Amino acid sequence: MRFPWPLFVVLVQAGLSFASALGPEEVARRFVEEWLAGRVSPSLEEVFRSSKDELPQALERLFAYPPPPKGLRVNLDAPLWEGGRVRFPATLGEEGGEVVVYLEGGRVERVAFVRKGLLPPFAQSEAGGLFLLLFGVYWAVALRGKGVLAQLFREALALLRQERRLYLGLNLLLYGLFALGSLLAFLEPGLARSVQKGIGGALELIGLEEVLFRGVLPLLAAIYYWNLTQGLLLTTLLPGLFLGLPALLLNASRYLLFGFALSPALIPLPLYLLHLPTLLLELQAYILGSFGGALLLKSLLRREGYRVGLGRLLLMGYLGAFVLLWAALYEAVEVGVFLR
């Protein structure tokens, strides 16, 4: 069964015709009206019904025109046009934000509801980045001493040596899934490119796009905050509390997806090699978190108690946070200096 897009195509073509006669604010306003009425976004059912050849295009459109959240209220009378996009104030319940319509050549490329406050001011500022840079240097120097930071670091390394078979096994499994995803992208480049666009759009929604042009220090703060809170704490260490298995499953799917979307099949080899250290370091931090969850499970199986296992999980979280900080610094320099 072919993917049913006749109405969608009509709307896009109408947008193109509007562009010749109307300003960008009016083009965006009319598009948002159609979007809120449910006449633009494909449903998941329609995506799942699409054929193999149609799936990349279906996913790309789903990511570009996601269904609006239920209860979203948009002030269409106060558009703000700047730099290829039109912003409308919006609310979702008590949560503030804005609907952003991205235009290119008079055509609506994508639309999204961007929530306010996903990145706190500290995580977008030069002061926040400078603090993290100085703290990172202090942290690295302190590891050579005898203080708490050094003691925790040595205990974490001792655990890695003690359980090296489990640690190496997790590295082989998770890095292997990342490599497998990269290879699969060579077989399905169209689908991989659609997934890549979806991941890129998700990063824009959290505010990282706004920080890209503010310099290395704000980038450092934003990247580290997001990777630490969302990547390590919420999706690795917190699931790791439930006997480690949820964290392992989440990261297994994440590594396969990241490999698929960030494959050299899609990215020029020089850029891929430049970004590879970031990928390896960030993924290593999440491997450490998954390893901590596995140690928690192993402690219970050995009847050593949940508290012992929890301590080991937190030690791995400490080590992962250290790795993430230096990964964020490298990525901030990479994006803020070399890729500008």
Predicted features along the sequence, with ranges:
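Terminal transmembrane helical module of multi-pass membrane proteins
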Residues: 288-340
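Selective detector of the "anchor" transmembrane alpha-helix that sits immediately C-terminal
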Residues: 122-146
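Interfacial/capping segments of alpha-helical transmembrane domains
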Residues: 182-206
